[in-house]
């Protein structure tokens, strides 16, 4: 059984796929968002034990989300190639929501790390004598603007998790799960796109092959007509030169068949008979083969 024969129409799998895209996965994403809010709250308040528990619970949700996406991916792989565009439209909103939720979750820790780097850099700068002063550009003190921006960042950035806390280790595990989830969502999108590109490539090759076959068929038909037209003339010329029964034999020899009539006229007649016989054979052969659709017919359809 070929791969295409194992595929099914989207309408047969649509209810199961929509159950994932509209119910199961959105529910997981909503649960993940609640974990994110709790994690931000516990980390900001420095409640490390609660933060550790929330990291573990969030990790379970991420694993469940990954499992559900894989199950949906199995269904997507069964969809017939003709329905891949509709399938892509169906799963794209879910894919974008999952990618955005994962990126937003990872951004929590990223902002904390960036803020920590800024704090270390500022502390190093304070240890050195100040060599520059704030300058004024268009009436705005750049030093004051940078200080205001830094204080605003400190308000929203989360405090660093102490390395001696279990929450630090549980976050690393959760972060790895989130990154794997992000890769899974990306791979699923690439899988559907690659299937469509593969189909488009096959279609292009089929169209090119059809053009080549069509042109080759025309050339063969022309060559066959030229060959058939030459048979009576060649038979007449050779039959006229040789004459008699041998001339007739020579006339048939040109056509590829021997018979016994006689003379130059009979040589022409022998070639003519073979021409008709070969013409009938060619018509019978071409009529038994299916017509190749031309490129103009495809465009019109």
UniProtKB/Swiss-Prot annotation:
Protein name per UniProt: Syntaxin-17
Superkingdom classification of source: Eukaryota
InterPro entries per UniProt: SNARE (IPR010989), STX17_SNARE (IPR028676), Syntaxin (IPR045242), Syntaxin/epimorphin_CS (IPR006012), T_SNARE_dom (IPR000727)
Annotated localization: Endoplasmic reticulum membrane; Smooth endoplasmic reticulum membrane; Endoplasmic reticulum-Golgi intermediate compartment membrane; Cytoplasmic vesicle, Autophagosome membrane
Record gene name: Stx17
Function as written in the Swiss-Prot or TrEMBL entry: SNAREs, soluble N-ethylmaleimide-sensitive factor-attachment protein receptors, are essential proteins for fusion of cellular membranes. SNAREs localized on opposing membranes assemble to form a trans-SNARE complex, an extended, parallel four alpha-helical bundle that drives membrane fusion. STX17 is a SNARE of the autophagosome involved in autophagy through the direct control of autophagosome membrane fusion with the lysosome membrane.
Lumenal membrane side: 249-253
Region (Necessary and sufficient for localization to autophagosome): 228-274
GO cellular component: a single term: endoplasmic reticulum-Golgi intermediate compartment membrane
Modification after translation, per record: Phosphorylated at Tyr-156 probably by ABL1. Dephosphorylation by PTPN2; regulates exit from the endoplasmic reticulum.
Residues recorded with modification Phosphoserine: 288
Family as reported in the entry's similarity comment: Belongs to the syntaxin family.
Ranges in coiled-coil conformation: 49-128
Entry-annotated residues carrying N6-acetyllysine: 41
A biological process from GO: protein localization to phagophore assembly site
Cytoplasmic topology ranges: 2-227, 275-301
Effect of residue 156 to E: Alters interaction with COPB1 but not with SEC24C
Residue ranges of domain t-SNARE coiled-coil homology in the record: 161-223
Species this chain originates from: Rattus norvegicus (Rat)
Annotated positions of the Phosphotyrosine modification: 156
Gene3D superfamilies: 1.20.5.110
UniProt-annotated stretches for the region Required for interaction with COPB1, TMED9 and TMED10: 273-301
Segments passing through the bilayer: 228-248, 254-274
CDD domains, A to Z: SNARE_syntaxin17
Span(s) of short sequence motif Endoplasmic reticulum retention signal: 298-301
